[in-house]
Amino acid sequence: MAALVAALLIRATDPTASYVARVADRSGRAGAVLAGALVAILITHAVAAVAGFFLAPHLTPNPKRLFVAFALLAAASGGIWPGKPIEPGEGRHPFWTVAARLTVGGWSGRTEFVTLALAMSGTAALAGIGGFIGSAVVLGVAAIGGDMVWRTLPHRAIGIVLGGLLAVAGFWLAFSALRLI
């Protein structure tokens, strides 16, 4: 459940959603774009969950909690200070274009980093599934709605509010892991 909520909050402020919306709008093939996005996030969240599963036995509970706190704070910084938008580029096959771009970009993604951290501190499979579902909901809305719908949302305000929520949760976990509260 934590991974699902975190993925919803983080992916809503992520440049990948606007990228998916732009490619779906330009290509006119929202289904292919959404399928490519789903394949990419399935791969990246599965790898994050498996990596978290194998890293978990090597850490005690407080470092695991501190790792989750660091992941949430990194995600909060991306929400408060938005990154550069991803340019759609020219691709003839929107499925492969989106799948490749999101898979390669997912290795440094904030959502996948939080999924990795949550997989280390709990049930890895549920963290991977939750991260996938949360990301799929946001990217599905972006692909089906297209660029015109996605552009009308107040992204700056959403980023500040969601980034603030993630920062509060991250600081709370960090202070808890350091036994300051």
What are the residue ranges of the model-derived segments?
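Juxtamembrane transmembrane-helix termini in multi-pass membrane transport proteins
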Residues: M1-F53, V114-A124, G128-F132
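Transmembrane alpha-helical segments of integral membrane proteins
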Residues: A17-Y19, A48, A136-M148
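Juxtamembrane boundary at the C-terminal end of a transmembrane helix
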Residues: F171-I181
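Small-residue-rich segments of transmembrane alpha-helices in multi-pass membrane proteins
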Residues: A40-T44, F95-W107, I160-W172
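Membrane helix-loop-helix hairpins that form the core translocation module of multi-pass transporters
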Residues: G28-I86, I144-W150, V161
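Residue-level signature of transmembrane alpha-helical entry/exit and packing/kink sites
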Residues: A2-A3, V33, R65, P94-V98, ...
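Alpha-helical multi-pass membrane helix bundles of inner-membrane/thylakoid proteins
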Residues: A74-G105
